[in-house]
Amino acid sequence: MKKKKALISIPYLVSIVFLPWWVSLSFNKSLEPWITNWWNSEQSETFLNDIQEKNVLERFIELEELFLLDEMIKENPETHIQKFRIEIHKQTIQLIKTHNEYNLHIILHFSTNIICFVILGGYFFLSNEELIILNSWIQELLYNLSDTIKAFSILLITDLWIGFHSTHGWELMIGSVYNDFGLAHNDQIISGLVSTFPVILDTIVKYWIFHYLNRVSPSLVIIYHSMNE
């Protein structure tokens, strides 16, 4: 019975790990030409939101001031007016092109993420029996571990996710989600989320240890608190 569970659970676990990556890669390649063609031919707006437009205008003004200052300090500024205009035109085109590529990247990744969530949801729904077997197999594996290893694993996972050094990891993860879904980067919101999520998770873990582990395995709780101290 254990061997049968392992034969079913291991391939299913591997498929769960690699399916999102495979779906993302496949749909990125297949959707990219279609989205690029749609954006360049039918989309009238250059910017996805007002924040992007504001950032581009600020960058354009900055470039214009830098080039103007550069021309003013030259010996014969009048002879460089035409060159100045040409250079500003080139930089403007490059700036808009860069933001156009960035918008395509946002739309492509957002579409791929939505499709990936839908496919994963359907996969879990259709493979409900395999999911139950996987859950049973994991519970058996955890049950066979010693209390010391269990306590060490809990301590390691909690330190990685809600420990003192987890802040930078949360910033990278939330920033990555922001980029994938095309949300404008906001340091205040990210800072608030980084300071909130670990606290919520820490509270949930403490409640789980107090409510569940104290009832199931008091010795595990004692070992965990001893290691934590």
UniProtKB/Swiss-Prot annotation:
<feature type="transmembrane region" description="Helical">
    <location>
        <begin position="106"/>
        <end position="126"/>
    </location>
</feature>
<feature type="transmembrane region" description="Helical">
    <location>
        <begin position="189"/>
        <end position="209"/>
    </location>
</feature>
<keyword id="KW-0813">Transport</keyword>
<keyword id="KW-1133">Transmembrane helix</keyword>
<keyword id="KW-0633">Potassium transport</keyword>
<keyword id="KW-1001">Plastid inner membrane</keyword>
<protein>
    <recommendedName>
        <fullName>Potassium/proton antiporter CemA</fullName>
    </recommendedName>
</protein>
<feature type="transmembrane region" description="Helical">
    <location>
        <begin position="7"/>
        <end position="27"/>
    </location>
</feature>
<dbReference type="GO" id="GO:0006813">
    <property type="term" value="P:potassium ion transport"/>
</dbReference>
<keyword id="KW-0630">Potassium</keyword>
<keyword id="KW-0812">Transmembrane</keyword>
<dbReference type="InterPro" id="IPR004282">
    <property type="entry name" value="CemA"/>
</dbReference>
<keyword id="KW-0472">Membrane</keyword>
<keyword id="KW-0375">Hydrogen ion transport</keyword>
<keyword id="KW-0050">Antiport</keyword>
<dbReference type="GO" id="GO:0009706">
    <property type="term" value="C:chloroplast inner membrane"/>
</dbReference>
<dbReference type="Pfam" id="PF03040">
    <property type="entry name" value="CemA"/>
</dbReference>
<keyword id="KW-0934">Plastid</keyword>
<dbReference type="GO" id="GO:0015078">
    <property type="term" value="F:proton transmembrane transporter activity"/>
</dbReference>
<comment type="similarity">
    <text>Belongs to the CemA family.</text>
</comment>
<feature type="transmembrane region" description="Helical">
    <location>
        <begin position="154"/>
        <end position="174"/>
    </location>
</feature>
<keyword id="KW-0406">Ion transport</keyword>
<comment type="function">
    <text>Contributes to K(+)/H(+) antiport activity by supporting proton efflux to control proton extrusion and homeostasis in chloroplasts in a light-dependent manner to modulate photosynthesis. Prevents excessive induction of non-photochemical quenching (NPQ) under continuous-light conditions. Indirectly promotes efficient inorganic carbon uptake into chloroplasts.</text>
</comment>
<dbReference type="GO" id="GO:0015297">
    <property type="term" value="F:antiporter activity"/>
</dbReference>
<keyword id="KW-0150">Chloroplast</keyword>
